[in-house]
A protein has these predicted regions:
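Polar-ligand-bearing catalytic/cofactor-coordination segments
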Residues: 2-7, 36-142, 187-258
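Hydrophobic alpha-helical transmembrane segments
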Residues: 12-27, 159-177
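Alpha-helical transmembrane anchor segments and their immediate juxtamembrane flanks
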Residues: 17-26, 147-151, 239, 246
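N-terminal signal-anchor transmembrane alpha helix
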Residues: 22-44
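Hydrophobic alpha-helical membrane-associated segments
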Residues: 27-35, 176, 180-192
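Membrane-helix exit/interface motif
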Residues: 121-127, 149-160
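Long, charge-patterned amphipathic alpha-helical coiled-coil/hairpin "stalk" segments used as oligomerization
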Residues: 129-154, 170-174
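Membrane-embedded alpha-helical transmembrane segments of multi-pass integral membrane proteins
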Residues: 146-149, 153, 178-185, 238
Length: 258
């Protein structure tokens, strides 16, 4: 009887914790939405401001690459949804959005330099960049790389609440591994992006390609990107905790029935 009461108390505590974490996920998710909207506003605003050197995103990226002996790295246009502004180690190319590549805007200047600086970090064998490349070859596919994570998370939620025994352990463990994997990669991505941003500021200053005002605007833009990365890490961590609690509740219910 005492064991039963203990299991019931533990189960109630886990249920309360699950609700609290669920609410936190909702709050952080809302904050993430607000940040994304604000980032889109700033990105668009700066994309309508002419940069002082009148260079397109492609021209700027090409210059950075050539100045660092990376002539073999290509600069390609990409759609906004699949790849976005990014650098691919495996395909040896810097990808810029259509709205960025051919524009002589402040956004184009910042994105062109910063993404090219990722290639420079790769060439210099930056430790965080090396870890990111080793752990995540799918980084090439941008947001679509997280589709398996979403699918596994959905499957986890279904099976944990509808199955028992082996399914809970196998799918639960698999789902948790995906979340841990995503968190580690998000941290590495944040580190490499920040390093590339700092390299971009230094390059623009040394080459006299941006005014003090432009550099401040770019810092504001990249700061929002970094906040978004941090927010995503927090969200993924909460989702990991949420799924741990789901598994714990399922296992507690299973033991109560025995």
């Amino acid at each position: 009887m005492e064991n039963l009461n203990l299991e019931m108390t533990l189960g109630a505590g886990l249920e309360i914790a699950l609700v609290i974490v669920g609410l936190l996920i909702g709050i952080v998710g809302f904050v993430s939405f607000v940040i994304s909207c604000w980032l889109a506003v700033k990105y668009t605003k700066f994309n309508h401001i002419e940069n002082s050197v009148h260079m397109t995103g492609e021209e700027v990226a090409r210059k950075v690459l050539d100045d660092h002996g990376l002539e073999k790295i290509k600069v390609k246009v990409t759609g906004s949804l699949m790849f976005g502004n990014s650098y691919s180690h495996y395909f040896k190319k810097v990808r810029l959005r259509r709205m960025t590549r051919h524009k002589t805007s402040l956004t184009a200047l910042g994105m062109g330099v910063q993404k090219a600086c990722l290639a420079v970090l790769d060439k210099e064998k930056d430790p965080d960049m090396k870890k990111q490349i080793r752990l995540y070859p799918m980084i090439t596919f941008g947001p679509f790389a997280f589709i398996p994570l979403i699918l596994v998370g959905t499957a986890l939620e279904y099976f944990v609440f509808n199955q028992s025994g082996t399914c809970v352990y196998v799918l639960g463990g698999l789902g948790l591994l995906f979340y841990v994997y995503a968190i580690v990669l998000s941290v590495l991505t944040l580190r490499t992006e920040k390093k590339a941003q700092e390299r971009a500021y230094i390059y623009l200053q040394e080459k006299h390609m941006a005014t003090a005002s432009e550099l401040e605007d770019l810092r504001e833009l990249f700061r929002l990107y970094n906040i978004q990365y941090i927010n995503d890490i927090i969200l993924a961590s909460l989702e990991l905790l949420y799924n741990v609690l789901q598994i714990a509740i399922a296992l507690n219910k299973g033991s109560s029935k025995k």
